[in-house]
Each structure stands twice: as structure tokens, then as C-alpha cells.
């Protein structure tokens, strides 16, 4: 058993790293690189929880252009309130607070329902929006902060919106709060 684990661990780790890199690039297509940011995961999770989100902040990367200028951040979140368990995804947020979108790295929702969170009809609703938070609605959205739920999968829709909201909240703390130094480990 241990020998099989040793043989498969390195390829699995490499595949996971590649999946992350692809997710980062998907939410920051104009970035030429990403710098991992040190942050206090426990402090970040507590602040997000204190704001009412049952999500965790798993990683923070700074997106940079070819000259090394900061474009924004990629914040990887695990939403724990999906209908079939946790959903892990990366959210790209520009320096001005505009959400570029999200890219899912781990999901096991119901095929034909919750899995539609990976489809453009749903995820495109989050792209290029500057909002304080997203709200899920069952009808056509009337404003930028509204996301039309996936038919038959309101739980997954809300999990995705809440995860994006947790990332937005954390991003705002990085820029607008005295707590920023604690959050990023400065």
C-alpha cells in the first residue's frame, strides 16, 4: 500500500499543480505569471466566517504582467455548502475590484444539475463584474450583482456565489482594512 502511494504521489501532486496553474490563467488571461502570497489561513478563514461565509481561503496568488506589475489577485476558495459537498475554485479579482470570473478545480456535484456551474451560461454571469457581493435569483438578473440560479440546482448556485463573495470580502480586507497586515502575513 505504502509503495503504491509513493509511486502515485508525485504524479498526482504535479497534476494538481497543473490544474491550479490552468485555473489561475483562466481567471487572469493577461497575466504572465503568479506570485504565491504568504497569508495567515486561520486568520483569513476566521474573518470570512465572521462575515457569515462557510468557506475557506486556500491560496492567494498575485497576478503579474510581463514587467512584474501587479494586476490583481487569484484567491482560491473552498465552498463547503455545495449540494454534494465541497467545491474548490479560484476567483480572479483585478486591483480595482473587478471580478474576472472563476475557474473550478474540484467539484463533484450532480451531473446535469450542479455540474452546470462549470458551463459558460452560468460562470459567465460572474465575469467582469464590480460588486460588493453576488445574490442568487431565480429569474433573469436585474442588476450586475444578481446571478440567475442553475435550474434545479439552487444550492450549487448559492455555494458558487457565496464562495465568490468570500473571495471578494477577503480581497476588500486586503486593501481597505487595518487587518490586511495580519491577513497576508506582513
Residue positions per predicted region:
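Internal alpha-helical transmembrane segments
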Residues: 1-11
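Short extracytoplasmic/periplasmic juxtamembrane "stem" segments immediately C-terminal to an N-terminal membrane anchor
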Residues: 10-30
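Short extracytoplasmic
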Residues: 23-50
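Structured beta-strand/loop patches that form or line metal/cofactor-binding pockets in enzymes
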Residues: 57-89
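Flexible, solvent-exposed short loops/turns enriched in glycine
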Residues: 80-86, 95-153
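C-terminal binding/interaction regions
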Residues: 153-157, 162, 169
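Conserved small/polar residues in nucleotide/adenosyl-binding loops
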Residues: 175-180
Amino acid at each position: 500500500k505504502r509503495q503504491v502511494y509513493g509511486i502515485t504521489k508525485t504524479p498526482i501532486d504535479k497534476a494538481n499543480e497543473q490544474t491550479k496553474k490552468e485555473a489561475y490563467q483562466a481567471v487572469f488571461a493577461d497575466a504572465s505569471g503568479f506570485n504565491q502570497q504568504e497569508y495567515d489561513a486561520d486568520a483569513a478563514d476566521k474573518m470570512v466566517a465572521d462575515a457569515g461565509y462557510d468557506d475557506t481561503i486556500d491560496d492567494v496568488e498575485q497576478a503579474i504582467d510581463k514587467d512584474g506589475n501587479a494586476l490583481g489577485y487569484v484567491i482560491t476558495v473552498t465552498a463547503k455548502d455545495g449540494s454534494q459537498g465541497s467545491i474548490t475554485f479560484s476567483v480572479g479579482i483585478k486591483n480595482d475590484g473587478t471580478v474576472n470570473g472563476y475557474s473550478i478545480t474540484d467539484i463533484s456535484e450532480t451531473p446535469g444539475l450542479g455540474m452546470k456551474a462549470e458551463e459558460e451560461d452560468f460562470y459567465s454571469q460572474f465575469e467582469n463584474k464590480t460588486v460588493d457581493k453576488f445574490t442568487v435569483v431565480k429569474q433573469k438578473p436585474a442588476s450586475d450583482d444578481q446571478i440567475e440560479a442553475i435550474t434545479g440546482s439552487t444550492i450549487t448556485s448559492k455555494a458558487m456565489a457565496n464562495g465568490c463573495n468570500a473571495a471578494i470580502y477577503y480581497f476588500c480586507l486586503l486593501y481597505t482594512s487595518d487587518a490586511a497586515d495580519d491577513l497576508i502575513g506582513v
